[in-house]
UniProtKB/Swiss-Prot annotation:
The keyword Amino-acid biosynthesis does not apply. Belongs to the class-II aminoacyl-tRNA synthetase family. Phe-tRNA synthetase alpha subunit type 1 subfamily. Its cofactor is Mg(2+). This is Phenylalanine--tRNA ligase alpha subunit. It comes from Bacillus cytotoxicus (strain DSM 22905 / CIP 110041 / 391-98 / NVH 391-98). The keyword Cytoplasm applies. It comes from the Bacteria. It is found in: Cytoplasm.
Length: 344
């Protein structure tokens, strides 16, 4: 039995040394140390030995089993290490190789235009004010000189959520809140960009949701000439120094007097073409002097303070600036369209 144990040990250790993969080692473990292996058979035959031989043979069996088990564990560890090293070597990245260029994205054209407009007015000392898109009827209409029975409410079809809550139809509501929240009732100089909503049918020039940017200035001794000068600076910054402006009388409930502002056509330079419908002028925004009722409702003394306001659609400005003929292009997310506006 002792000779057999030594022979089993030699064969097992030889097979372990020759093993090239983990599966082979597992086969050796099962063959020699498993329940049906020769080591187990030797242990079962211990009962046939004399009491004097059992301790010595038991110690020898344990020695052989531990030697095989220890060598198996060492070999498994070595093979696993070799496998890991081979895997790491195959996945090694040569950091000296030239990298692949990362394709950069770009601003959405509307985002770019809004930021350009903000930059122009911030350069003139304006602050950017924002507000909620879900608004109370009061701030969207009543605080802007549009009481519940005012016929001008029909000018804007509105998405109502409840009787007193709606999706704002203009960012003028931000102006109303800013004036009301100005506890000192002092000067204000803000622009208000944001999304607005109207029940329009979507077509080439209309959308049920669009971006609007409005401006408000409140101070003492504000005149119409201040409004005109501000808009002249804006137009020349956005469309070029050669652009001219003209103001036409109009009507808005929250301003008096009210005007529409046109700029000289950038396609024909005022001579008349299809873009400007032969007039040489293109309308871009509405404006006017803040109505005294609006000032009074916000807590201002309309005899001491005056103001002007203006509002424009970002899509309208972007369409003119980039020559886009359909407002829907801004919302279809066609990559071919958007990539044209990638900044250098």
């Amino acid at each position: 039995m002792e000779a057999r144990l030594k022979e089993l040990k030699q064969k097992a250790l030889k097979l372990i040394e020759e093993a090239k993969e983990l599966k082979s080692l597992n086969d050796v473990r099962v063959a020699y140390l498993g329940k049906k292996g020769p080591i187990t058979e030797v242990l079962r035959g211990m009962g046939k030995l004399s009491p004097e031989e059992r301790p010595r043979m038991g110690a020898l069996v344990n020695e052989v089993r531990e030697a095989i088990q220890t060598r198996l564990e060492e070999k498994v560890s070595n093979l696993e290490k070799a496998v890991m090293e081979a895997k790491l070597a195959s996945e090694t990245i040569d950091v000296t190789l030239p990298g692949r260029p990362v394709e950069t994205g770009c601003h959405h054209p509307l985002t770019a235009v809004v930021e350009q407009i903000e930059d122009v007015f911030i350069g003139m000392g304006y602050e950017v004010a924002e507000g909620t898109e879900v608004e109370k009827d009061y701030y969207n209409f009543e605080a802007l000189n549009l009481p519940k029975d005012h016929p001008a409410r029909d000018m804007q079809d509105t998405f109502y959520i409840t009787e007193e809550t709606l999706l704002r139809t203009h960012t003028s509501s931000v102006q109303a809140r800013t004036m009301e929240n100005n506890k000192e009732k002092g000067p204000i100089k803000i622009i208000c960009p944001g999304k607005v909503y109207r029940r329009d049918d979507d077509d080439a020039t209309h959308s049920h949701q669009f971006m609007q940017i409005e401006g408000l200035v409140i101070d003492k001794n504000i005149r119409m000439s201040d409004l005109k000068g501000t808009l002249q600076v804006f137009v020349k910054k956005m469309f070029g120094e050669d652009r001219e402006i003209r103001l036409r009388p109009s009507f808005f409930p929250f301003t008096e007097p009210s005007v529409e502002m046109d700029i000289s056509c950038m396609m024909c330079h005022g001579k008349g073409c299809g873009t400007c419908k032969g007039t040489g002028w293109i309308e871009i925004l509405g404006a006017g002097m803040v109505h005294p009722n609006v000032l009074e409702m916000a807590g201002y003394d309309s005899k001491e303070y005056q103001g002007f306001a203006f509002g424009m659609g970002a899509e309208r400005i972007a369409m003119l600036k980039y020559g886009v003929d359909d407002i829907r292009h801004f919302y279809t997310n066609d990559v071919r369209f958007l990539q044209q506006f990638k900044r250098a």
